[in-house]
């Protein structure tokens, strides 16, 4: 029987369409351009977001097609897309020179997940339920599906109303207004308070005791939607409150208090929803033993919950506008694992995982527990396999063989493991980046073999003639007991790459025990071991704030510092005990003024010596400072922004301003923490927030002057004429254009900035101050097939902005 692939995430994603597969359907060969495709979709989302700030119209046609494809049996990484979208929150106004517009974040979420005019609420639940069945072998009841669908419909109606009143208040004729009216401000205020109350009542349905792990992704999306409603209202209030009201008047004081309450409630809800998500996650966490199947079950659950919820939960604190007013990129260094592959695919057994990183001198290594595995700060270049092969004539050829060793080549070091020493050169090359690894094993009368492959290479040196007679089960693969055959069924994880391959041994192996077993750890595809700040947004050229996990550093020589799981942060934390020091290396690509912050948890006030030093000796920060004890944000009391935080497993996480403003030149620098206190402190990430953004792009105009000296190309079947093209490093934003000397019954079709417009006698062959959906670099023109245009002139001007 053909083995059906298990689905790893609860929401489908774009997985290796058309990639060659093994007899189980597992992908082999190159993974293709799945990451490039996703990045292109994110680019489209960004362009739509920028256009929305410009004209108040949010277009997500490409994303709706992706959703329709998922419903029809295809796949689309919606949760990855939302994470990318949330990272654009701070780009508000960045696309409009000199304008800061409080456009609602909720427009993005509603547009991505539930496009208007469709029944995608119910479809989304159906898709999730289908995937849940394949991952966890459990199913939502029809009654609950109907209830959740009703809740999501109500959610959508509410947030859509809030979205509409904000857009109506801030845009007129698709252009940002210069002043919001008092009546429109009150409409926004009223819509916000109606939305918040009903969303709160509906959230409880998503985390019932019976179905909590099945509805976890929907809970995360619902909470994200409510937090985005907070964000949209607060951003609107921050922008317009003091422009609409006299804050010393009774009316102004009332509206000011309403905004302050919204901020307080948002912080409380971020803490509450995070706590609920963590409790749900840990409450359903499978027990972890040393058995292979138990480890696989644990990893099936954790990777599903991380990819489908916890990665988004980690971004919730960044939605609070007063803490994160500019675009920020949070690096995620958490690791997740695919199913263990190799040694014996049809047998369970007690497993010992080998810590391949504990030395570079030997092929033998000590053991490591699954939850002790953390991010290794280097980039995998390739993996190599060493093969054992015995020609077992006259019975068969190449059926007594297996990989016995693995070699991992990183930028800085090479690590190896094997039943015997594999050396430094392998028989099989597996170039990075890799996204999936699988294995097949068979032990029978004249066969004892194993093959291992990834999406970039394979070890098809062994002749194994078995096949599966079962379907794949989560954490089990497939097998055929009568022939001693088994095969893993790992599948690429959305937006993830293999970061390391940990060898393991197991008991109860069929045949020779020297066959290779591997456990793959995965990290986000765009994660680099280099710590860089000062990166610029490619479109706006603004410097992007950066949140870099502290675990990307190193302990002082001779010290052993603990790295500990913290599921809600998107990264592990560094437990810095009294007297210990921790270092991190950075490169700043853009010098300027920065705010430096640290996110941490501590039960006591902790004195920390903080040293930021450049190569060459300059010391912008060289201070002993106290990191205050952090407390959980209370449900009802007033909120102290400095010390109250988000509760995790190891403490309550809060932001500490290390330096409100400091000049950080471009170049290489290092940060060192030393705990001079009497208790441990848990360090999550360092944040570098730029304070001096580049000047807004300058406006100018460029002329349009296109004489028609030959027939203008027809609209159908001919490439259009380019009648204007940018000059210099600019993009067009607006145009005024007209045609003279053309036939009165003719039509000129313009293509500009994603829009199509017609010049004909109905508009006097003229457009005045037209702003297309997107900025543009050229204008194209063609004519109707019915009337040729062979003479005349097209003139006008384009308003452009320097990049």
Swiss-Prot record:
Keywords annotated in UniProt: Sporulation, Toxin, Virulence
Instruction: Kindly list the GO molecular function terms attached to this UniProt entry.
Output: signaling receptor binding; toxin activity
* Record SUPFAM superfamilies: delta-Endotoxin (insectocide), N-terminal domain, Galactose-binding domain-like
Question: Pfam families from the entry?
Answer: Endotoxin_C, Endotoxin_M, Endotoxin_N
List the GO biological process terms. sporulation resulting in formation of a cellular spore; symbiont-mediated killing of host cell
Q: Which InterPro entries match?
A: Galactose-bd-like_sf, Pest_crys_dom-III, Pest_crys_dom_I, Pest_crys_N_sf, Pest_cryst_dom_II
What does the further note read?
Answer: Toxic segment of the protein is located in the N-terminus.
According to its UniProt entry, the function of this protein is described as: Endotoxin with nematicidal activity.
Q: Which family does it belong to?
A: Belongs to the delta endotoxin family.
Q: What is this protein called?
A: Pesticidal crystal protein Cry13Aa
UniProt lists the gene as: cry13Aa
């Amino acid at each position: 029987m053909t083995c059906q692939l298990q689905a790893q995430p609860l929401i489908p994603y774009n997985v290796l369409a058309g990639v060659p597969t093994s007899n189980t359907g597992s992908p082999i060969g190159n993974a293709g351009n799945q990451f490039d495709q996703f990045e292109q979709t994110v680019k489209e989302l960004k362009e739509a977001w920028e256009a929305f700030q410009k004209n108040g119209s949010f277009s997500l046609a490409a994303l709706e097609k992706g959703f329709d494809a998922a419903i029809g049996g295809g796949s689309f990484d919606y949760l990855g897309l939302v994470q990318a979208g949330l990272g654009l929150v701070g780009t508000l106004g960045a696309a409009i020179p000199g304008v800061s517009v409080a456009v609602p974040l909720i427009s993005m979420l509603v547009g991505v997940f539930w496009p208007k005019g469709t029944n995608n609420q119910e479809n989304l639940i159906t898709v999730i339920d289908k995937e849940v069945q394949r991952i966890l072998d459990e199913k939502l009841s029809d009654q609950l599906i109907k209830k959740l669908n009703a809740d999501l419909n109500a959610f959508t109606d509410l947030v859509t109303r809030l979205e509409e009143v904000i857009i109506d208040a801030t845009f007129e004729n698709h252009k940002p207004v210069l002043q919001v009216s008092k009546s429109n401000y009150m409409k926004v205020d009223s819509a916000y308070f109606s939305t918040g109350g009903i969303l709160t009542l509906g959230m409880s349905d998503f985390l019932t005791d019976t179905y909590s792990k099945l509805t976890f992704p929907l809970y995360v999306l619902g909470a994200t939607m409510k937090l985005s409603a907070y964000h949209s209202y607060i951003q609107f209030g921050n922008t317009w409150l003091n422009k609409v009201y006299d804050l010393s008047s009774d009316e102004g004081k009332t509206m000011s208090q309403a905004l302050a309450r919204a901020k307080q409630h948002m912080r409380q809800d971020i803490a509450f929803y995070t706590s609920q998500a963590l409790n749900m996650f840990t409450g359903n966490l499978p027990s972890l033993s040393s058995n292979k199947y138990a480890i696989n079950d644990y990893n099936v659950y954790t990777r599903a919950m991380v990819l489908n919820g916890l990665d988004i939960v980690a971004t919730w604190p960044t939605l609070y506008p007063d803490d994160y007013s500019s675009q920020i990129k949070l690096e995620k260094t958490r690791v997740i694992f695919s199913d263990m592959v190799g040694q014996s695919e049809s047998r369970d057994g007690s497993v010992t995982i080998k810590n391949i990183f504990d030395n570079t001198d030997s092929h033998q290594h000590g053991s490591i527990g699954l939850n002790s595995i953390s991010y290794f700060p280097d980039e995998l270049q390739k993996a190599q396999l060493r093969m054992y092969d015995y020609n077992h004539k006259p019975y068969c050829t190449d059926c007594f063989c297996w990989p016995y060793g693995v070699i991992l080549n990183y930028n800085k070091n090479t690590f190896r493991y094997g039943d015997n020493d594999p050396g430094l050169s392998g028989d099989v090359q597996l170039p990075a980046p890799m996204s999936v690894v699988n294995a097949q094993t068979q032990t029978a009368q004249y066969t004892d073999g194993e093959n291992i492959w990834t999406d970039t290479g394979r070890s098809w040196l062994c002749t194994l003639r078995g096949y599966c007679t079962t379907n794949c089960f989560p954490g089990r693969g497939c097998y055929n007991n009568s022939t001693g055959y088994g095969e893993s069924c790992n599948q690429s994880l959305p937006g993830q790459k293999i970061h390391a391959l940990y060898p393991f041994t197991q008991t109860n192996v069929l045949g020779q025990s020297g066959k290779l077993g591997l456990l793959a750890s995965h990290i986000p595809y765009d994660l680099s071991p280099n710590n860089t700040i000062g990166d610029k947004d490619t479109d706006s050229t603004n410097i992007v704030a950066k949140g870099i996990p502290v675990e990307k550093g190193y302990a002082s020589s001779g010290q052993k510092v603990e790295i500990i799981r913290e599921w809600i942060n998107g990264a592990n934390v560094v437990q810095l005990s009294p007297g210990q020091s921790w270092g991190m290396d950075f490169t700043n690509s853009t010098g300027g003024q920065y705010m430096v912050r640290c996110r941490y948890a501590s039960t006591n006030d902790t004195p920390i010596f903080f040293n930021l030093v450049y190569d060459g000796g300059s010391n912008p920060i060289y201070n002993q400072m106290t990191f205050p004890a952090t407390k959980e944000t209370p449900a009802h009391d007033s909120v102290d922004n400095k010390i109250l935080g988000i509760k995790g497993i190891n403490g309550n996480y809060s932001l500490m301003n290390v330096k409100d403003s400091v000049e950080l030149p471009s170049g290489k620098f290092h940060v060192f923490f030393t705990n001079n206190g009497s208790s441990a402190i848990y360090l999550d990430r360092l944040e570098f927030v730029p304070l001096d953004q580049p000047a807004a792009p300058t406006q100018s105009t460029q002329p349009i002057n296109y004489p028609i000296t030959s027939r203008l190309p027809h609209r159908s079947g001919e490439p259009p004429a380019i009648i204007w093209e940018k000059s210099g490093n600019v993009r067009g934003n607006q145009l005024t254009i007209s045609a003279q000397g053309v036939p009165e019954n003719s039509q000129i079709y313009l293509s500009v900035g994603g829009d199509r417009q017609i010049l004909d006698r109905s508009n006097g062959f003229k457009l005045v101050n037209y702003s297309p959906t997107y900025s543009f670099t050229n204008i194209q023109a063609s004519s109707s097939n019915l009337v040729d245009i062979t003479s005349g002139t097209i003139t006008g001007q384009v308003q452009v902005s320097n990049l």
